């Protein structure tokens, strides 16, 4: 016997969270809970404003239609990426095919004062990996901050993300302020320039490795080994079903590229599932999941070690 519930939720964000020039005041999304007999599976559907093609209202319509079809015996996945991902996670939990083991080691995200990151990294056991958003301020400032961090922590490797913010000139201004002796400790820089060709040229000219992120979701993208390209950053909420995520990871690994499972600012429920997916598909790579502290609460499932208050399922708005 099948049954299902759909919940709508909204989490207040910390002040100062900006996505593509818009301030994100709340994180809005949906949960689906599928039950069959004694088994249960959850999934999160939370399109990311400015990045997802669909809104959460559109996702809600597609999700409710899919749930009704599933209750009637149809299991075909929807095409909308955020819904396909959430539904496939719920189905995987239901079938017990999403392993429980999780990688909760997140590369800490530097959102402001580099001194805060230095203190956080001092306590980090094992491999020291952190992420810094660049492209939000002047490229020269970004270069100086990155250089400071690499100089202060000799065993640090940085992941940088520019979200295609730079012109070729700004990319050169950034690189000018990063000591060439430190550049090999930039694990990769995600999408430095507005076009892939400019990003490739940046990698050639600076010796700083790059990673593809937004490019993975463009229709003309193909997985190929290229000089200067070291990694792909896979955001499942923006990608689609678990199977599509797995296919992308396998395609990257076949080319000896690093595949990084990364957050689209999901709630704690979605983040714990991403930690499980990372342990399953990319066991040797620290995932990019350090986004929970951008929110003011956890929901339904806790992230280990977080002190944020937890909103239980009874407090959510039920749609079905």
Curated annotation (Swiss-Prot):
Essential cofactor(s): a divalent metal cation
InterPro entries hit by this protein: Enolase-like_C_sf (IPR036849), Enolase-like_N (IPR029017), Enolase_C-like (IPR029065), Mandelate_racemase_C (IPR013342), OSB_synthase_MenC1 (IPR010196), OSBS_N (IPR041338)
Pathway: Quinol/quinone metabolism; 1,4-dihydroxy-2-naphthoate biosynthesis; 1,4-dihydroxy-2-naphthoate from chorismate: step 4/7; Quinol/quinone metabolism; menaquinone biosynthesis
Gene Ontology molecular function: any one: O-succinylbenzoate synthase activity
Highest taxon in the source lineage: Bacteria
A Pfam family that the UniProt record links to this protein: MR_MLE_C
Residues annotated as binding Mg(2+): 161, 190, 213
Biological process (GO), any one: menaquinone biosynthetic process
Coiled-coil blocks: none
Keyword Repressor among UniProt keywords: no
Name this protein carries in UniProt: o-succinylbenzoate synthase
Organism listed in the record: Shigella boydii serotype 18 (strain CDC 3083-94 / BS512)
Protein's gene: menC
């Amino acid at each position: 016997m099948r049954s299902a519930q759909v919940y709508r939720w909204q989490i207040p964000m910390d002040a100062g969270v900006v996505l593509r020039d818009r301030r994100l005041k709340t994180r809005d999304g949906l949960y689906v809970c599928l039950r069959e007999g004694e088994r249960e599976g959850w999934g999160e559907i939370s399109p990311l404003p400015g990045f997802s093609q669909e809104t959460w209202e559109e996702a809600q319509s597609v999700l409710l239609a899919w749930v009704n079809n599933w209750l009637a015996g149809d299991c075909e996945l929807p095409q909308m990426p955020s819904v396909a991902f959430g539904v496939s996670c719920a189905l995987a939990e239901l079938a017990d095919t999403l392993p429980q083991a999780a990688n909760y080691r997140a590369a800490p995200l530097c959102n402001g004062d580099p001194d805060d990151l230095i203190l956080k990294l001092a306590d980090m056991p094992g491999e020291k990996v952190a992420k810094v958003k660049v492209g939000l301020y002047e490229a020269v400032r970004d270069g100086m901050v990155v250089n400071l961090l690499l100089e202060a922590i000799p065993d640090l490797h940085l992941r940088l993300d520019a979200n295609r913010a730079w012109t070729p000139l700004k990319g050169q201004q950034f690189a000018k302020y990063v000591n060439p002796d430190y550049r090999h400790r930039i694990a990769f820089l995600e999408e430095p320039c507005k076009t892939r060709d400019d990003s490739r040229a940046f990698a050639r000219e600076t010796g700083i490795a790059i990673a593809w992120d937004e490019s993975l979701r463009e229709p003309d993208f193909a997985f190929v080994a290229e000089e200067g390209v070291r990694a792909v950053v896979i955001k499942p909420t923006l990608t689609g079903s678990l199977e599509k995520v797995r296919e992308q990871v396998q395609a990257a690994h076949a080319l000896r590229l690093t595949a990084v499972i990364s957050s689209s600012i999901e709630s704690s429920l979605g983040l714990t599932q991403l930690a499980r997916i990372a342990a399953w598909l990319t066991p040797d790579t620290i995932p990019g999941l350090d986004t929970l502290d951008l929110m003011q609460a956890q929901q339904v499932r806790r992230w280990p070690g977080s002190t944020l208050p937890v909103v239980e399922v009874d407090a959510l708005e039920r749609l079905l």
